[in-house]
Structure formats: C-alpha cells, structure tokens
Amino acid sequence: MDEDCEVTQLQEQSCWATLPDVCLRRVFWWLGDRDRSRAALVCRKWNQIMYSADLWRYRTITFSGRPSRVHASEFESALWYIKKFGRYLEHLEIKFLNPYNAVLTKKFQVTMRGLLSCLGKSNNRLRSLSIQHLELDRLVWRNSIRGSLIKSLSFFLKKMGKHLDHLSLKGARLTVEQGCHILNSLSYMQNENMASELNIEDFFSHHLAVYGSSQFNKAMATFRNLTFLTLNYNCISDELLETLSENNAGTLRTMNIKCHVHDPHGQVVWGMSWAKLARQASNLKVNFFFERVMKYERLARILLQEIPVRSISLRSCYFSDPDWSMRPTLTDLLPTFRNTLQKLTFEFNNNHESLDEQLHLLILACRKLFYFKIWAFLDVKFVERILKSQEEGQCSLHTLKVRIYTNRYETNEEDRTLREIYRKYRKLIDSELNYFVVAYPMM
C-alpha cells in the first residue's frame, strides 16, 4: 500500500514538474502576491516563473489614509514590490485614500520618493501612470510635504515622460504654477511629448481661472499626439482650442469636459474656435459633464452649436431652485445637437415642473441616442411611452435607466405599475435593452 502511495506521489510530482511554462504562468497570474510567494518556494522552475514579466505588467498600489494595524505594512510592501518587480511594470495606478493627518501624508510622500526613484532607475517600460484624488490643497498636506511630493513627481516625469502614453493626475488640486510645472516635466527630455491620453480633471484647485493662464497654454502646446483629453471647463479658452487644432488635429478623438459650479466658467469662447477644431480634428467627439450648472443662460454660453457633442450629463444632485426651469434647455438648447448626441444623463430636482413631454420629444429628436439615464420627478407612464416608441422604431436606445422620484414614502402603486409595464414589454426589454427602472421616495 505504501509503495502504491509513493508511486502516485511521484507521478503527481512529475506531472507538475513537467507542466509547460505557459500553463504555469497562467496559474501564477490568478494568484495573489502571498500565494505567488509561497508557490515560488516549491522548486527552482516555479521560482523562475515568479519573475515572468507578464505577471507584473499591471499594478494597483493602494495606501490607506487612516491609521490602522491592518494597513501598517502597506508602505513597506509597496517599496518592496517596486524594488523586486518594478522593472516589469507597464501600467501603474497609485491610490491614497482620504489621508487623515499630516503624519500619514508625510509617510506617503517619503514612500513615493523612494518608489518613484527606484522605478526611474530600473524601469523603461512604463506606459501608463495614474495617481488620482490626492487633493493636495487640503490642510493635511503641509507646504513642505506637498512641495517635496511635487518635486519627486516632477523629477520622475522628466526622466520617464518620453515613455508614457497615458497619464492621469485627476483630483490633484494644484495651483496653476505647480500644475504647469508638472506638465512641463513631461517634455523635459525633448521639446514635445507623445502622450496620447491625458486626464487633468480637477488637476487644478477650485476657483482658479486657468483659461487665462499663458503658462497653461504653453504647457499644453508641448502635447503633439493627444487622442483622449480630460479636463475642466475652467481650462478651456480660444488659445487652447487653437493649440489643439495646430498640434493634435490628426489624433484628437475625445475630449471630456467637466464644468462644476465652483469652477469659473463665465469665460467667452468663440464658436469659430470650436468650429476650427472640429474641422481640423474630424473624428473629434466632446463629452460634457455639468455639476450643479443647470441654468439655461449658463449652459447656452458653453454648449455652442459648433461643438461636436457626443454626450451630456446634467446633475444638480438634490438641490432645488424654484426659480430654475429645465424646460428651455430640453426644448431649445439640447435639440441643437440632435445629429450627434448619443448619451444623455440627467439628475435633477424638478418637483416644481413636469418635464415628461419635453424629455420624450428630446429622445425622439436625437436619432443617434443609444443611452438615456434620468433621476427626476416623472410620471410612471413616461417609461411606457419610451418603450412604445422603441417598439415602433422611433428611437434606438440600448440603455434605459430611470429613477422616478415621488413625494410619498410608499411606492407600492408605482412599483405595481412598473411591473405591469415590464410584463407588457418584456420581450422588447430582454432582447434590446439594458433596462433599470425604479420608483424612489424623495422626502
């Protein structure tokens, strides 16, 4: 019996020992760091697999912003990883979640200094870097700590900028001078940089009129290969659009523009500047995201008819203004983009006015619209009207998401009606739509 067991064990060992490298790498790919380390101790071959480049190309490093024993070692382990496997990295994402105090921001800054220094020395593969939501304008970031972090990041980008294809510094919240210093670091080794994706949404602090900065326009002039550009509307100017027309006309495909109520957005941007950019960059599509910028007069200054608008998101959260009306925007402004609009997202408190008819007509007018999401005060029958239009071929939605606000705690009646509507159009919904509809008490 013992001999049979030994034979079986030898067979099992030989089976694993002769497993092809491609299969072993696939097994390792599914393992977490701790299990990979344990597996690497099995034999020399498995240890060699541990150092396969394709296991370490993508990495997300998360630092907790709260003091905790559980997360105490994450700063040290991040450095250990970069020293051990950093040379294989191609895509790196770093997260620092809601720092609690200056002690933790200092610890993060010191860790980042070592991490970026090591990465700059050992890596020549990095294509994508994302460091989001640092919010460096918060009080937990003392001036010296903030300055040291910016210095380390700038030095790293000076060395690695020529390799980077994608850079996201969303939510950094810098001054204009600090932000432009970092952007200029990308082109330090040459007079231009070839990054194709740049995300600088909330890169600058609130209340800054970046559109008037010559520093910013000069920094953006170094980009010659942009395909995707994400930024705030307080960065948009005729000069920036002119720069994009001259330097990125052959590549620029998507612009994502966020306009927040606290960001300056009263600047004059001429339609001819947008028209020139749209003409030069013929494949350009622009997506707008408005947060608490809802009044028609403001929107009309921004949403010029010359812009090739693909998507519009209008969100006011739960703020209610009885002097505000959404109707002119739905009937006069948005239909201007009927030939290009593909996505519409609404979230507003319209308790003081009914908009069912205007919303329905807008959907019918935008023949390319495939995504429609709305959270608002609506009649339940609004959903049925949309489904009927879809069935009759008057619209071609792929996604329909509706949250129907009500002024009652109980939504039993609305829920029952929605179930009846679903049963009536179930075949259509199941075959054509990503469908989510719910009644929601708004008290």
Curated annotation (Swiss-Prot):
Keywords: Ubl conjugation pathway. Residues 13-59 form the F-box domain. Pfam families: F-box-like. Signal peptide: none annotated. SUPFAM superfamilies: F-box domain, RNI-like. InterPro entries: F-box-like_dom_sf, F-box_dom, FBXO31/39, LRR_dom_sf. Substrate-recognition component of the SCF (SKP1-CUL1-F-box protein)-type E3 ubiquitin ligase complex. Directly interacts with SKP1 and CUL1. This is F-box only protein 39. It comes from Mus musculus. The lineage of its organism: Eukaryota, Metazoa, Chordata, Craniata, Vertebrata. The gene is Fbxo39.
